[in-house]
C-alpha cells in the first residue's frame, strides 16, 4: 500500500515533508482510516489541521480537523471506532499511534513518538512509522514544550499518498 505524506508548516516557514509507512498487514482498518483522512477522499481530513499538543521528550499529537484543539475529529467509519489490536508496541521513536479517550474511542487523532513509550502499550494502537523527513521530526521536537503547547503554529498544509 502507498505511504502517506504530510507537508507541515512551522510558523510562517516553508512547509517540510514527512512520510509515513503504515502497517496495513497488522492493522488494516486503522491504516485505511489514516490514509483516507490524509487524502481527504471522503470530503474531510487532515489537510489544514494543526498539531495541537507537542510534549518535550514524548510526542506530537494532531488530527483534530473539526475543533483544532484536541476535542474533535472523526474517523472514516463514523465518530469513533474500536481498538483494532495491540500487537505492535511503542518500542522506538518515530512511531505513529492512535490518540484516544479510553478503550475503543479512536477517531482521527494520532501522535508521533519522540521516544519509546512502553506505558502506552495495550492502550493505544500503533499503526505506522516515519520513513522519511526525520529533519521534520526534529522540528517538532524543537517546537515542543513541557506543557504541550507548541512554540509556534504547526499546520498540515497538504497531505496525501506517495
From Swiss-Prot:
Residues 5-161 form the PPIase cyclophilin-type domain. Its EC number is 5.2.1.8. Belongs to the cyclophilin-type PPIase family. PPIase A subfamily. It is an enzyme of class 5 (isomerase). Coiled coil: none annotated. One of its GO terms (molecular function) is cyclosporin A binding. GO terms for cellular component: cytoplasm. Binds cyclosporin A (CsA). CsA mediates some of its effects via an inhibitory action on PPIase. It comes from the Eukaryota. It comes from Paramecium primaurelia. The lineage of its organism: Eukaryota, Sar, Alveolata, Ciliophora, Intramacronucleata. It catalyses: [protein]-peptidylproline (omega=180) = [protein]-peptidylproline (omega=0). Gene3D superfamilies: Cyclophilin-like. The keyword Isomerase applies. Keywords: Isomerase, Rotamase. GO terms for biological process: protein folding. This is Peptidyl-prolyl cis-trans isomerase. PPIases accelerate the folding of proteins. It catalyzes the cis-trans isomerization of proline imidic peptide bonds in oligopeptides.
